[in-house]
Curated annotation (Swiss-Prot):
GO BP terms, alphabetized: proton motive force-driven mitochondrial ATP synthesis; proton transmembrane transport
High-level lineage: Eukaryota, Metazoa, Ecdysozoa, Arthropoda, Hexapoda
Domain of life from the UniProt record: Eukaryota
Subunit and interaction comment: F-type ATPases have 2 components, CF(1) - the catalytic core - and CF(0) - the membrane proton channel. CF(1) has five subunits: alpha(3), beta(3), gamma(1), delta(1), epsilon(1). CF(0) has three main subunits: a, b and c.
Naturally occurring in which organism (per UniProt): Drosophila melanogaster
Protein's UniProt keywords contain Chloroplast: no
Keywords from the named record: ATP synthesis, Hydrogen ion transport, Ion transport, Membrane, Mitochondrion, Mitochondrion inner membrane, Transit peptide, Transport
Cellular localization per UniProt: Mitochondrion; Mitochondrion inner membrane
InterPro entries: ATP_synth_OSCP/delta_N_sf (IPR026015), ATPase_OSCP/dsu (IPR000711)
Entry protein name: ATP synthase subunit O, mitochondrial
Record function comment: Mitochondrial membrane ATP synthase (F(1)F(0) ATP synthase or Complex V) produces ATP from ADP in the presence of a proton gradient across the membrane which is generated by electron transport complexes of the respiratory chain. F-type ATPases consist of two structural domains, F(1) - containing the extramembraneous catalytic core and F(0) - containing the membrane proton channel, linked together by a central stalk and a peripheral stalk. During catalysis, ATP synthesis in the catalytic domain of F(1) is coupled via a rotary mechanism of the central stalk subunits to proton translocation.
Length: 209
């Protein structure tokens, strides 16, 4: 119950400004990371820090991904939450991060949610892309697509766009899906992988046995 109450008050915690109506993001992002990112968007919007927060988080994400020791430190379950929160606050202030960014890091540390930082950052990026009229699309395939396949897929995906929206595609290779592809575009998710079909058929056979 306490964690739910903290999330309900997240926007006010992130923002030092007086309580105002929540600023709704242009796209809904699900999960715990989505709730943190949505609250961050609302707080940063009120403080006119949307772009600065995205810049801060992008730089921080790149640093953590490239620095193994820092990554282990940030996600360590051993370090005291208050010590971690204080250290992050001091470091982010030295780096001149926006107040909304500083408060987010402190809150994640206080709540023991720093392991979620990478996914929170990705969720915030998704919201900001929608804010700019970009539709983020991730395509997962078993092997890299050639130029012709990529062009055909891009043409098909553009049919989902509306008005002045632009498409931003990221590709990822995951051999475990065997074949086919998995596409997430905006808030839509389509799994056309062979691995999922095999699992479906296996489940049907086991149920019928």
């Amino acid at each position: 119950m306490a964690s739910i109450n903290k999330l309900a008050l997240l926007s006010r915690t992130l923002s030092s400004a007086a309580a105002q109506a929540t600023v709704k993001p242009p796209v809904q992002v699900f999960g715990l990371e989505g709730r943190y990112a949505t609250a961050l968007y609302s707080a940063a919007s009120k403080l006119s820090q949307l772009d600065q927060v995205e810049k801060d988080l992008t730089a921080l994400q790149a640093t953590i991904r490239s620095d193994k020791k820092l990554r282990e430190y940030v996600t360590s379950p051993i370090i005291n939450k208050k010590v971690m929160a204080t250290a992050l606050k001091e470091a982010s202030e030295k780096l001149r991060f926006a107040p909304a960014t500083v408060n987010l890091l402190g809150l994640l540390a206080d709540n023991g949610r720093l392991k979620k930082l990478d996914t929170v950052i990705n969720a915030y990026k998704t919201i900001m892309a929608a804010h700019r009229g970009e539709v983020v699309c991730e395509v997962v395939t078993a092997k890299p697509l050639d130029a012709s396949q990529s062009k055909q897929l891009e043409g098909a995906l553009k049919s989902f766009l509306k008005g002045n929206e632009s498409l931003k595609i990221t590709s990822r290779v995951d051999p475990s899906i065997i074949g086919g592809l998995i596409v997430s575009i905006g808030d839509k998710y389509v799994d056309m992988s062979i691995a999922t079909k095999v699992k479906l058929y296996t489940d049907v056979i086991q149920t019928a046995a």
